[in-house]
């Protein structure tokens, strides 16, 4: 059985490593992106991504922009994993189509 592929997007390499290690141990295949622009490029290059775990505050393209771009063409599940914890941020995430915040 083929492993599900998860795209982990965060500009902090330590956070990506922490999430990746947890997911790999759970049996998932993990691809990393260090900024929003790389995330979009990777998503469209890899046609079999099953889930995106996405930070908000990143260089080049923030998580909100990434979500808008991907939601134009895909319903892939997106989980926001971010330090932005205000209610308005969470509401914006759900308005943009994230599945969990």
Predicted regions mapped to residue ranges:
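Receiver (REC) domain active-site loop signature in two-component systems and cognate sites
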Residues: 58
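Charged docking surfaces used in two-component/phosphorelay signaling
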Residues: 17-25
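Acidic, metal-coordinating helix/loop segments flanking the phosphotransfer/catalytic sites
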Residues: 7, 32-51
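Active-site residues of response regulator receiver
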Residues: 55, 82
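Conserved phosphotransfer cores of two-component systems
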Residues: 44-47, 69-76, 96
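Acidic catalytic/metal-coordinating carboxylates
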Residues: 35-38, 62-65, 70, 89
């Amino acid at each position: 059985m083929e492993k599900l592929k998860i795209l982990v997007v965060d500009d902090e390499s330590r956070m990506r490593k922490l999430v990746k290690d947890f997911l790999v141990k759970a049996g998932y295949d993990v691809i990393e992106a260090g900024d929003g622009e790389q995330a979009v490029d990777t998503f469209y290059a890899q046609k079999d991504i099953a889930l995106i775990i996405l930070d908000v505050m990143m260089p080049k393209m923030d998580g909100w922009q990434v979500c808008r771009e991907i939601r134009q063409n895909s319903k892939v599940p997106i989980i926001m994993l971010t330090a932005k914890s205000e209610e308005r941020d969470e509401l914006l995430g759900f308005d943009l189509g994230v599945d969990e915040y």
